Amino acid sequence: MIYAELSGGLGNQMFVYAFARAMGLCCQEPVTLIDRQDWKTGSPAHTALALQALHISSEVQFITDAGFAKQHLPVQNAAKALMIRHEQRAGLMDRDWHPFEARMAPMLNAIGLHFATEGFTPAKRGHAKNFLAWGYFQGADYFKDQAETIRAELLPIENPEHGFTAAAA
């Protein structure tokens, strides 16, 4: 199973979706997006789920559980927390940390985590039962092999009554 934690507004959520969906299509595995709903506690890193205004595949599931990764993906979640802590303590948040993330990617992918905050870092599925994607994935290289499908799914749902889009009912 491919899991991806959503963060940010609609634009960031679209990139997370594109990465996870492309990986799921490539690996022929189901995809579940985790909406941690941490905006409810005032976290600046996440806003409300916004993907429902797009033609998201019905094959992609959503979980709204702040503790899902910690509870069900403990190895991946612990590795993610260590990466964040290391980047904060090493001062990498203040400069380009992509080289560090790229060096760590093979080991993290092997245990079922892909951690990417900036730039393109190739992802490999690895042998872990579950795979957690965390980051922003802001690059077309993450989904170039599935670009036609992804682009079609990221189109807004048209609603003639409102002139442009509205959330799906």
Regions picked out by a protein language model, each given a short descriptive name:
Residues 1-48:
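N-terminal pre-catalytic "stem/leader" segment of glycosyltransferase-like enzymes
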Residues 45-169:
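Secretory-pathway luminal glycosyltransferase catalytic domains
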